[in-house]
Amino acid sequence: MDVNASKVDPKLLELLVCPLTKGRLSYDPEANELVSEKARLAYPIRDGVPIMLISEARKIEE
């Protein structure tokens, strides 16, 4: 996969919120995930598409 293809459009990032908390998300380029610090969840991005399902999110351990 092209490295640039996995980047998240900043405008999309402004629109997306955590489905659990409705809070802001940040992009983690190393893991290619959208992270909700408040919910302690990381949502995967697959083939350039954010998967915004709580059931698909990875729990962030401390």
UniProtKB/Swiss-Prot annotation:
Any single Gene Ontology cellular-component annotation: cytosol
Name assigned to this protein: UPF0434 protein Smed_3047
Gene3D superfamilies xref list: 2.20.25.10
Pfam families: Trm112p
Coiled coil stretches, renumbered: none
Family of the protein in this entry: Belongs to the UPF0434 family.
InterPro entries assigned: Trm112-like (IPR005651)
SUPFAM superfamilies given in the database record: Trm112p-like (SSF158997)
Endpoints of the signal sequence: none
